[in-house]
């Protein structure tokens, strides 16, 4: 879809991982990632790094969708992840929502849910607002 193509263009890692975009508004970004053996630990659990990449991508998209006027982009400057459950199959969904939108930082909270809708991770991150250099 067009949203997925847009996300892949802005963040090429999302294409490499196979992340898809289901929704993109300033209020909410929804990205999905399918479980794959190539994204797992040796025991078949979706790797925490893959989950964090999904969450960081969702958070970055949410920050970008809320950029103040005159800003050129964002960059993650802080991220905290709580893993609450293992993912052994199916699709995981990241839903990112802004908690604070300011002129210099944007704070995003992202929930990661498994295919049954169970919360398996929660991420809070701060994005710095980038401005063009004179």
Would you name each region that the model predicts?
Residues 1-134:
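Terminal targeting signals and extreme-terminal segments of soluble enzymes
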